[in-house]
Design a protein with these regions (language model features):
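Ser/Thr/Pro/Gly-biased, low-complexity, turn-/loop-rich segments
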Residues: 2-6, 17-18, 29-198
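Sec-dependent N-terminal signal peptides
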Residues: 8-26
């Protein structure tokens, strides 16, 4: 009987351990970013740039000085222009926005409008975690993770100097993965430097 009770107790302990391991593994999987998937980030590295809140656009309507100006993309992903009002730009390319503005101006405001849109200032990128000066910084073209960390003052004394976690919005969904230091950075990316394990 004592042998049977010990056997039951051992079985219960084993069940509890298995449940704890399974739960811990599941929670760790939720909290930790995915492994480095170069194809995911490489696929978006050379995609046409899409606009979002924080970008500043230079809009030129040729022959219409009152419409040509610099416009900031607001939190709703729109710019506000004279005559045509609010123009949605979130997730669109500058070419898409040129067509949209020209189409609206053609509706009774300007005959055969010629419109040029360019990004005057990109939205910032963010560096968090174990760096000297965490925060947001203005984007510079052809930037890598290494460059971004240097702009943030370099690694902190406890910063892991291998791969970092990079969060990028892809098709409207934030995706986080581990990337090497030579990975390209895009406007709006968030780089998180983890603490190294001693």
């Amino acid at each position: 009987m004592a042998k049977n009770a010990a056997s039951n107790k051992t079985a219960r302990v084993a069940q509890v351990l298995l449940i704890a391991l399974a739960t811990g593994g599941a929670l760790a999987g939720c909290a930790a970013p995915g492994a480095y998937r170069p194809e995911l980030y490489a696929a978006t590295a050379h995609d046409p740039y899409t606009l979002s809140a924080g970008d500043r656009l230079r809009v030129i309507v040729f022959g219409q000085d009152s419409l040509s100006n610099t416009y900031s993309v607001d939190g709703a992903g729109r710019i506000a222009m004279p005559l045509i009002g609010s123009v949605p730009v979130q997730g669109r390319t500058v070419t898409d926005v040129e067509r949209e503005i020209a189409g609206r101006l053609r509706e009774g405001y300007v005959r055969e409008p010629r419109v040029s849109v360019e990004v005057e200032a990109f939205r910032p990128f963010f560096v968090l975690g174990e760096v000297t000066n965490a925060g947001q910084y203005p984007f510079v073209d052809a930037m890598t993770v290494r460059t971004a960390i240097a702009i943030a003052g370099g690694f902190g004394p406890r910063g892991y100097q291998g791969a970092v976690d990079l969060t990028r919005v892809i098709d409207g969904v934030p995706v986080t993965g581990r990337v090497p230091l030579d990975a390209p950075v895009r406007p709006g990316d968030t780089i998180t430097v983890r603490e190294r394990i001693f």
